[in-house]
Amino acid sequence: MLDINYIRQSPEEVAGMLKKRRQEEDCATLDELLEYDRQRRELVQETDALKALRNKVSKDIAVIKRTGQGSAEDLIREMKEVADRIAGMDETLGEIEKQMESILLSLPNKLHPDVPEGYSAEENHICKDPVAFDHALDFPLMDHLDLGNKLGILDFERGAKISGTGFPVYIGKGARLERALLNFMLDCHTENHGYTEVFPPFMVNEDSLRGTGQWPKFADQVYYMNEDNLYAIPTAEVPVTNLHRNEMLKDEELPISYAAYSACFRREAGSYGKDTRGFLRVHQFNKIEMVKFTRPEESYDALEKILQNAEAILNALRIPYRVLLLCSGDISAGATKCYDIEVWSPAEKKYLEASSCSNFEDYQARRANIRFKPAGSSKPTYVHTLNGSGLATSRLMVSLLENYQTAEGTIVVPEVLRKYTGFDLID
């Protein structure tokens, strides 16, 4: 959530950001917000003046009653009218503040100067040359779906029978390989990268979704359990960031770094017509999430660190990948700057997103009320929050199976995973 003081002082800057994000329609909403803000400030001044008058006259009435000098009836009648006016103005003020909050929750975050301007994913910048590993794929390739079916390690048909399309089933060595990936990534982040492991709930309340920015704007992407008023998490970012909702952190605690495994659930509304084969687009998948809480001046260094931590996983697995800096028309609403890591699918002959690493500055912290007191200061300020996929296994599995396939249709297990799987070949 943006600071209303920043919006009031820099409306042209906010409008420019909305245009860069291709959200010109929100400029009218911005004007509406500024008008509500003007009305609110006027009302606050008026009510404060009336409350000051009421306090003064109440003391005068008390003196008259105590001394018996004169009648206080006229003043009492006048103050009742003032009290009624204050009550009506407070009610109007509450309605205005609700409207302001609704608009503030819907506005996207400001953009970092490094973010390139662009309309869509086609205009994202490749900021790191593709990292390649020689897997000697000089034979007719199978895609991950055919490999999974042939080897009996994936079953999308039975997943569809159980739950519907987009719910995969891992079987035998496929399940073991998935678990190995997750354990390897968690161990790498906690033992090598300094993260504290968290195992969060997979269902959250509305306040948690609001805190990280999925609610209300992206509510249609989230699975909802109406009877219990709970939501299935789209990412561990939601519960882990909300660990510190409504908390005042200590300066010496920062930065805080968490790594969490979770299943992720996404409706993917509006994805019809896109390539939905196999793992390319699913409703349930597994992911390791990295989440950081930092001092404001340290957050962009922390973003680069998160990116390095995610890349370290792919380098250890020897998975080909590239890094993109997202443009203004493709970056998520809450992020000020975001890198995507895409892994190479040799069968699809294209890169697939496997990780997003984002800095939200104080956007989520304002929504979730996460603050700290800087050393030497008595005034609290908001932390900066960051997160990154470290990584999502669905598309990572696509790249792993396809890059590690052999001419015989078997899968060589990456060396770093063998201590977790207990085998080096899937046949």
Swiss-Prot record:
Keyword Metal-binding recorded: no
Keyword Ligase listed: yes
Subcellular location: Cytoplasm
Entry's Gene Ontology BP terms: selenocysteine biosynthetic process; seryl-tRNA aminoacylation
Catalytic activity line of the entry: tRNA(Ser) + L-serine + ATP = L-seryl-tRNA(Ser) + AMP + diphosphate + H(+); tRNA(Sec) + L-serine + ATP = L-seryl-tRNA(Sec) + AMP + diphosphate + H(+)
Enzyme class: ligase
Main subcellular location of this protein, as a coarse class: cytoplasm
Pathway: Aminoacyl-tRNA biosynthesis; selenocysteinyl-tRNA(Sec) biosynthesis; L-seryl-tRNA(Sec) from L-serine and tRNA(Sec): step 1/1
Listed EC numbers: 6.1.1.11
Gene Ontology cellular component terms for the protein in this record: cytoplasm
Comment field on protein domains: Consists of two distinct domains, a catalytic core and a N-terminal extension that is involved in tRNA binding.
Family: Belongs to the class-II aminoacyl-tRNA synthetase family. Type-1 seryl-tRNA synthetase subfamily.
Name under which the protein is recorded: Serine--tRNA ligase
Species this protein is from: Chlorobium phaeobacteroides (strain BS1)
